[in-house]
């Protein structure tokens, strides 16, 4: 029996959250085409044979001077020091420059490269990319081609990860899917619904704070504030006669209900907080409130 923590690191939008969801075969981590959709570390638990792997999905590594982005990167770097294995996720279409940037952080634990999205390319392109990574072979333990859309890739990746975990009793009940709080997961589903409904119309300027939960045997009641930075963005979130906010609520309610396995009453409010992305105390609360 082995049990340990694996930090998933990679460029923004390399497919980290989608990879976690494919390993779980459940939707736990926030999936969106928006950059840095994952703002908190999500712990997802995968049972592989008799072994327990706890995945920590971190914000994407990137270069930016914005306060929010700096804190996200700090969070990702801290995660690397708190794990047993690092899984570096890169798209087969990415250059190796992202991996070189990762190496410059001087990771102190073993790491494996998951070369993601291989279902979208041909064998010749895959072999070329593998040869590009070969010059770094003294640094990584293994490089594993992966596709989140094909279950046949799952066992090979998990087998490789388990090799580098220590023998240890389970850290969590093996029936759990995620060690993250349900409140945090509900928040992520709301945020994902915002991205899906507004797409590129709304800049990366919204956050969700859940300020009330009441769970009964047959009904889950949630009240949440959507934080945005301008009145114009507030108007976009609400939409004409509240249509957009109703659509966001409907989509989020469906996802939350599926996870909670009960009817959900979700009340959404929109609040303007100017320059929230530069308010360090507010951001630290967002990132650490539920860890």
From Swiss-Prot:
SUPFAM superfamilies found in the cross-reference section: P-loop containing nucleoside triphosphate hydrolases, Prokaryotic type KH domain (KH-domain type II)
Give every Era-type G domain span.
2-167
The record lists GTP as bound by 10-17, 57-61, 116-119
Q: Native species of this protein?
A: Campylobacter jejuni subsp. jejuni serotype O:6 (strain 81116 / NCTC 11828)
Entry similarity comment: Belongs to the TRAFAC class TrmE-Era-EngA-EngB-Septin-like GTPase superfamily. Era GTPase family.
Q: What is this protein called?
A: GTPase Era
**Record gene name:** era
What is annotated about its quaternary structure and interactions?
A: Monomer.
Q: Where in the cell is it found?
A: Cytoplasm; Cell inner membrane
KH type-2 domain ranges (all copies): 186-274
Q: Where is this region: G1?
A: 10-17
Main localization, broad class: cytoplasm
Q: Which domain of life is it from?
A: Bacteria
Q: Which HAMAP family does the entry mention?
A: GTPase_Era
* Biological-process GO terms, alphabetical: ribosomal small subunit assembly
| GO CC annotation, single | cytosol
How does the protein's chain sit in the membrane according to the entry? Peripheral membrane protein
What residue spans carry the region label G2? 36-40
* Region annotation G5: where it falls in the sequence: 146-148
Q: Name one Pfam family in it.
A: KH_2
């Amino acid at each position: 029996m082995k049990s340990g923590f694996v930090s998933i690191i990679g460029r923004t939008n390399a497919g980290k959250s989608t990879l976690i969801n494919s390993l779980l075969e459940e939707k736990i981590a926030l999936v969106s085409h928006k950059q840095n959709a994952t703002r908190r570390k999500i712990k997802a638990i995968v049972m592989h044979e008799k072994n327990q792997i706890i995945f920590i999905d971190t914000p994407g590594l990137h270069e930016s001077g914005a306060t929010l982005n700096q804190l996200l990167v700090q969070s990702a770097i801290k995660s690397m020091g708190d794990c047993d294995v690092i899984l570096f996720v890169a798209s087969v279409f990415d250059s190796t420059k992202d991996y070189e940037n990762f190496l410059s952080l001087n990771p102190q634990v073993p790491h494996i490269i998951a070369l993601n999205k291989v279902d979208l390319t041909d064998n010749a392109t895959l072999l070329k990319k593998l040869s590009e990574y070969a010059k770094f072979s003294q640094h990584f333990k293994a490089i594993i081609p992966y596709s989140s859309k094909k279950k046949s890739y799952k066992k090979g990746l998990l087998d490789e990860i388990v090799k580098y975990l220590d023998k240890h009793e389970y850290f969590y009940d093996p029936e759990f899917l995620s060690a993250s709080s349900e409140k945090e997961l509900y928040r992520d589903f709301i945020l994902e619904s915002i991205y899906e409904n507004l797409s590129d119309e709304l800049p990366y300027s919204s956050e969700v704070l859940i300020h009330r939960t009441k769970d009964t045997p047959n009904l889950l009641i949630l009240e949440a504030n959507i934080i945005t930075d301008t009145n114009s963005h507030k108007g976009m979130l609400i939409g004409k006669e509240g249509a957009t906010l109703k659509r966001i609520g409907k989509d989020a309610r469906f996802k939350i209900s599926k996870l909670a396995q009960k009817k959900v009453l979700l009340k959404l409010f929109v609040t303007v907080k100017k320059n929230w992305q530069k308010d360090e105390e507010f951001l630290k609360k967002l990132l650490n409130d539920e860890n």
